[in-house]
Structure formats: structure tokens, C-alpha cells
Amino acid sequence: MVIQKWVGARVGLMGNPSDGFGGKTIACLVRNFGAQATLRESSTVEIVRHPVYDPLSFSSLEHLEETAAHDGYYGGIRLLYATCSKFRHYCRERGIQLPDRNFALQYDTNIPRQVGLGGSSAIIAAVLNALMEF
């Protein structure tokens, strides 16, 4: 079984970031950009790193430094890890029985980083949609 979920980028026109404090916003979808989560049934729970956004090997120390300067120290793995953990916690706290199955989870995105298009939110929403269907 393979589940794929896509969530579009969004741009906040008014109110950002007041929504984080109970405020209201006006936002719109940017269809050109989005994030996708792919979930496959597996024998273990596996979070698959993105080869571009979650690098673990570099051609040189200079390449590592340039990557860190451009992308920061965190990739999308932490978002998948946190979403899965919080999903499990939410279900357990509410007595929602989850099936006794494991999965491999990966993401892809073409949302530009650090430009206010909600890239992290789109990844989280796509993962959550895939987990709920699974």
C-alpha cells in the first residue's frame, strides 16, 4: 500500500503571524508550490531522509559549511519525526486505537525556503493527511 498526499504552499496576505496567538489571517494557496508525503507499509517505522534537504554526506567541509549557511541546521526530518510523535500522542490520549502496522515515510517539496510560503506547515499537513489515511 502506498499513500501519497500533497499540500499546497500558502502566502499570508494579512494577519501573519497573529494566527499563532489566536488572531485571524487572510491567506491564499500558491498552487505552483507544494509538499508531498509518501507513506508505504513497512516492517519497521522508518523516516526516510530527503537526499537534498537532509544531507548527511558532503563533498568537503566547505560544502558542509555552505549548506549549513544556506539551509540552516535543520531539514525536514525533524518535521516528520515530530508529526508522527504528536499524532501517536494525540491518538493515545483520546483512546483512538491505531492499527498495529508500520510504515516508511518520506517527503518532497518544491516550496522555496525562508520566503513565507509555509513550507514547514505544508510538509506537516501532508504527513498528517497520510497518517490519517493509513
Residue ranges of predicted features:
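ATP-binding N-lobe of GHMP and related small-molecule kinases
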Residues: 1-117, 129-134
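Short, conserved phosphate/pyrophosphate- and ester-handling motifs at nucleotide-, phospho-/glycolipid
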Residues: 120
